[in-house]
């Protein structure tokens, strides 16, 4: 029987309302609630089961250095999307140590077919998505990548190159600051004695690459508040002409900023370009964190995966 203040002692209702033996007497038992609203923790993101492989197309002559760089970029992408099947194919590869892009794609296609046949379901999509490890367009290299894709018979998809993009402007800024050629933080107005007052943005791929690099160059110029001009390493005299143009506009201390990942150029080319311009050079972009994030962002856009904000960026076209 219940009283006005609650169930009577000894009644079934009272027993049901009593706290468990381990609970403190007289205290309410708080049940865990699922967090909602903007403070709710996001669900952990993972690659969908059966998602296409991400194949990183690495240009240039294969080497231990280019393999380490590509593996680090792939590792960054995997850390942002657990379960991602990331592979590396070399445009100029051709052996077990440095497998060619064509061979990697053919192997991915064979595995994809076996999986589809085992599931007995319609083909869900491409076997692989190819992401060129290039900061900007290089028509000759992209033509070779497309040819390898066609020869593989994989039906793989090809994404855009990584730039132009604000994240690449950030990476360029970091590389310049590491070389002592720019302030490490544009918000801190301390003086760097060797800071450049004019930047040559070095790229490869001819005029198309120069125009694309110029877009990222404008973003870099806004970050550093110094003039930035793009020039092609593969156009004779372009670097020295650009250096002269900057000096004529008032720049006294120039710096070379490679708008390059690294494997796409031969050893010594950057040093020769810096000597031609009469200035110091920063390192190539390499496996900087945003490079791996852009690789993943291009893959995700092709596959239809929505990434968290920190793992993607808004491209500039």
Predicted regions and their residues:
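Active-site-proximal alpha-helix that buttresses catalytic centers in soluble enzyme cores
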Residues: 1-317
């Amino acid at each position: 029987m219940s009283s006005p203040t609650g169930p009577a002692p000894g009644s079934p209702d009272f027993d049901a309302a009593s706290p468990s033996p381990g609970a403190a007497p007289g205290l309410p038992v708080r049940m865990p609630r699922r967090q909602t609203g903007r403070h709710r923790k996001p669900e952990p993101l993972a690659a969908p089961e059966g998602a296409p492989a991400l194949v990183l197309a690495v240009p240039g002559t294969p080497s231990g250095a280019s393999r380490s760089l590509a593996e680090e970029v792939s590792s960054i992408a995997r850390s942002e999307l657990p379960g991602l099947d990331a592979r590396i194919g070399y445009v100029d590869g051709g052996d077990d140590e440095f497998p060619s892009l064509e061979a990697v794609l053919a192997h991915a296609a064979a595995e994809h077919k076996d999986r589809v046949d085992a599931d007995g379901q319609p083909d869900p999509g491409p076997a692989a998505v190819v992401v060129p490890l290039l900061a900007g367009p290089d028509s000759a290299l992209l033509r070779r990548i497309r040819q390898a894709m066609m020869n593989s018979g994989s039906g793989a998809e090809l994404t855009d190159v990584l730039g132009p993009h604000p994240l690449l402007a950030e990476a360029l800024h970091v590389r310049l600051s590491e070389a002592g050629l720019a302030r490490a933080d544009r918000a801190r107005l301390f003086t760097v004695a060797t800071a450049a007052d004019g930047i040559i943005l070095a790229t490869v791929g001819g005029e198309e690459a120069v125009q694309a690099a110029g877009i990222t160059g404008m973003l870099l110029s806004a970050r550093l508040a110094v003039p930035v001009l793009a020039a092609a390493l593969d156009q004779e005299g372009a670097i020295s002409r650009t250096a002269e143009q900057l000096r004529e506009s008032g720049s006294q201390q120039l710096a070379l900023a490679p708008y390059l990942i690294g494997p796409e150029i031969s050893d010594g080319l950057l040093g020769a370009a810096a000597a031609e311009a009469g200035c110091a050079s920063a390192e190539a972009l390499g496996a900087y964190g945003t490079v791996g994030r852009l690789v993943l962002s291009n893959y995700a856009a092709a596959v239809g995966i929505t990434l968290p904000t920190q793992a993607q960026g808004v491209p500039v076209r």
